Every structure is written in structure tokens, then in C-alpha cells.
């Protein structure tokens, strides 16, 4: 059964640009599915949403980020900080 929702003009404009011939319901559903699939910080978010990184670059960025995070944890323990 259809439901009526209210959205701001700027959100409407953004959804209109995203829908590309699909219904608003299909577009919103796709966004929700995408969010649910990627809400835990998946590198594919950048690939799918923005297309700014290829698979190799995304993997390298994830690896570098992990190394940086590990180095901060190591320093904190080494200096006696918690």
C-alpha cells in the first residue's frame, strides 16, 4: 500500500538525479539496500558510490589505513597511555 512521505526540496532534487528512469520507491529501496550492505565501513563504498578508486587503490588504501591504526595503538601502549 502506498505511503506519503514529506522530503525537503533539496532531497527531492538529489533523488530525482539518482533515479534515472526508475521510480522513487526503487531508488530509495536501492539506497537502503546499499546502506545496509556497506554500513560497517566497506571499501566498496568508495568504489560504488564515487568510483574514485579502482580495486587495487582501494585495497592499498585499506592496508595503509590499518597500518597507521596499528602504529597509533603501539605508540599508546609503549608510552603507557591507554
Curated annotation (Swiss-Prot):
The keyword Transmembrane helix does not apply. It comes from Sulfolobus acidocaldarius (strain ATCC 33909 / DSM 639 / JCM 8929 / NBRC 15157 / NCIMB 11770). Possibly the antitoxin component of a type II toxin-antitoxin (TA) system. Keywords: Toxin-antitoxin system. InterPro entries: Put_antitoxin. Belongs to the UPF0330 family. This is Putative antitoxin Saci_0468. It holds the Pfam family VAPB_antitox. The lineage of its organism: Archaea, Thermoproteota, Thermoprotei, Sulfolobales, Sulfolobaceae. The keyword 4Fe-4S does not apply.
